[in-house]
């Protein structure tokens, strides 16, 4: 035995190195239990979410999501076609509007030309009427002068004959 004058009591070596409170084995046991509990919780959650993912509601949701995606794609395609059709229709409308404007301008020019031609025709008709009147006057004057000449021509002939007869009488 050791001398009695040491100030501490003799302690066995294996007790000396162990920490006070819980031992390392207990810590490992607690850690293992926690890992197993966490694993069980994770497995339960995976099973729960796997069942939820394969449930009818989830399948219906996925099917509806696919239908919505397809419908959205179809609607986008139809919208694109409608926009293209609208653009083409607007271009045709602009072309038609331009054609209408050109035709309106052309019509205004034609109306103006027609009015000018009608005014010219009216002027020429008036001139023709005036010339016809003058022609009628000249015909009337010619008839009068012809009648006068015929009348005066007959008296000239008669007077010429009388003079001739008188000269012949006087001469013989």
Curated annotation (Swiss-Prot):
There is a cross-link at residue 20 (Glycyl lysine isopeptide (Lys-Gly) (interchain with G-Cter in ubiquitin)). Its main location: Golgi. Residues 1-26 are cytoplasmic. Glycans are attached at residues 70, 97. Pfam families: BST2. Ubiquitously expressed, with highest levels in brain and liver. Present in liver (at protein level). One of its GO terms (biological process) is negative regulation of cell migration. It is found in: Golgi apparatus, trans-Golgi network; Cell membrane; Late endosome; Membrane raft. Gene3D superfamilies: 1.20.5.1700. Residues 103-149 form a coiled coil. Residues 153-172 form a propeptide. GO terms for cellular component: apical plasma membrane; cell surface; cytoplasm; Golgi apparatus; membrane raft; multivesicular body; plasma membrane; side of membrane. GO terms for molecular function: identical protein binding; metalloendopeptidase inhibitor activity; protein homodimerization activity. InterPro entries: BST2. It is a single-pass type II membrane protein; Lipid-anchor; GPI-anchor. A lipid is attached at residue 152 (GPI-anchor amidated serine). Residues 48-152 are extracellular. The chain crosses the membrane at residues 27-47. Parallel homodimer; disulfide-linked. May form homotetramers under reducing conditions. Isoform 1 and isoform 2 form homodimers and also heterodimers with each other. Dimerization is essential for its antiviral activity. Interacts (via cytoplasmic domain) with ARHGAP44. Interacts with MMP14 (via C-terminal cytoplasmic tail). Interacts with LILRA4/ILT7. Interacts with RNF115. The extracellular coiled coil domain forms an extended 170 A long semi-flexible rod-like structure important for virion retention at the cell surface and prevention of virus spreading. This is Bone marrow stromal antigen 2. It comes from Rattus norvegicus. The gene is Bst2.
